[in-house]
Amino acid sequence: MPSMLERISKNLVKEIGSKDLTPVKYLLSATKLRQFVILRKKKDSRSSFWEQSDYVPVEFSLNDILEPSSSVLETVVTGPFHFSDIMIQKHKADMGVNVGIEVSVSGEASVDHGCSLEFQIVTIPSPNLEDFQKRKLLDPEPSFLKECRRRGDNLYVVTEAVELINNTVLYDSSSVNILGKIALWITYGKGQGQGESLRVKKKALTLQKGMVMAYKRKQLVIKEKAILISDDDEQRTFQDEYEISEMVGYCAARSEGLLPSFHTISPTLFNASSNDMKLKPELFLTQQFLSGHLPKYEQVHILPVGRIEEPFWQNFKHLQEEVFQKIKTLAQLSKDVQDVMFYSILAMLRDRGALQDLMNMLELDSSGHLDGPGGAILKKLQQDSNHAWFNPKDPILYLLEAIMVLSDFQHDLLACSMEKRILLQQQELVRSILEPNFRYPWSIPFTLKPELLAPLQSEGLAITYGLLEECGLRMELDNPRSTWDVEAKMPLSALYGTLSLLQQLAEA
């Protein structure tokens, strides 16, 4: 289920009518996006079951990586425009049953959300982009660019932004009112009873003037000291990376195996020179070679003719195996390290920026300084010598990636779950939803098992239902029934991975 900000941003983009505009999902991004700001997109996810599709604003702009220029770059402002998006839904139902006992139930439900905002569209004209491309990269290359090169990131530039002109309040409220009556014939007459239940939920979010609701981007391509701002998203930012996809055509006639996906490979990854890979790329595409170098869930499987293997992303067992392997590695860390991780992640859950900073440091394999809870994790990892024979950062990054797939509201609920120590019960409940429905692309009704709901109790159940609702499932506290939605599969998978690894840390 999209957040309030994401829902309004998507509706605004539809109203503007531009397919190239990307709606903003997170509040943190809305505060950092500006014209010329550089965006970072990670190359691959560590999971086969979710992806990090968001473009993350970095703390730099084009001006920070290029040689200074005396020319003044202008922008074109279109607007102001006024946009109002208000939706009110009301539902009413009545039901009566008479099987010796007369029972009647009536209910009303209403949903009300929306906003009213003023915005303008700020665009960088093409001639200004051409002026940028005439400037050279700073020498020496900025350190953050070196970090992005090491990670294999793709970089983009914001060229158009939809900005708020005034402060705006987004609101969301829902209510459910249920009235029930019962009549029972007894020996001396008729007994009657009735009850009523009312549930109201309200949320509000204030957006500050200048925040960006949507944006357009172009690919940043770096060749030696020159830059290119391109409309082609298929290029790599750092052109010295070697693309395995470039080798596929050359190897097609020589190999009987098929790759499930393409991977960008740096020649140093396999201790091979770039010359070796260019001269004999087929040696690096054999099933035997890939089996030894790709993760288990990405390995190539060649079946005899006539046999069909179910795609791994449609089998819940593959997700379980993937998560289990990460838990097994995480469990090798000392209890002290796991304790620090648990409480540090708990402290960072309400700060998406802090989580992203920790991921950046871990991906760089850097011993650089980081303040706060993230720094505590890095320091503890450096002090601990029990992991000389395995890479402890892989399961940590896997956990952080899974957390980052979830919404800011889910982060709040996760923090409550960690404090109440109900992670195991939640993990079992999520598993009970995913396991029977994982392979189905259509809507299927399901009922949550009472024995899985009972241990959560009232407050824990409300927290858990909130986590499920944010994944895209329609949940009601008074009703264990819901309907499977394939759009909920990815966030539910990320939630399952998050709960599983956090539970390992909790019980260490």
UniProtKB/Swiss-Prot annotation:
Induction per the UniProt record: Expression in induced by STAT3 and CD274/PD-L1 in response to hypoxia.
Location of region: Triggers pyroptosis: 1-257
Modifications made to the protein after synthesis: Cleavage by CASP8 relieves autoinhibition by releasing the N-terminal moiety (Gasdermin-C, N-terminal) that initiates pyroptosis. The cleavage site is unclear. According to a publication, it takes place after Asp-240 in response to alpha-ketoglutarate. Another paper reports cleavage by CASP8 after Asp-365.
Residues marked Cleavage (site): 240-241, 365-366
Domain of life from the UniProt record: Eukaryota
One Gene Ontology term from the biological process aspect of the record: programmed cell death
Tissue: Expressed mainly in trachea and spleen. In the esophagus, expressed in differentiating cells and probably in differentiated cells. Also detected in gastric epithelium.
GO molecular function terms listed in the Swiss-Prot or TrEMBL record: phosphatidylinositol-4,5-bisphosphate binding; phosphatidylinositol-4-phosphate binding; phosphatidylserine binding
Effect of residue 398 to D: Low spontaneous pyroptosis-inducing activity
Comment text on domains: Intramolecular interactions between N- and C-terminal domains are important for autoinhibition in the absence of activation signal. The intrinsic pyroptosis-inducing activity is carried by the N-terminal domain.
Name recorded for this polypeptide: Gasdermin-C
Organism per entry: Homo sapiens
Gene, per the UniProt record: GSDMC
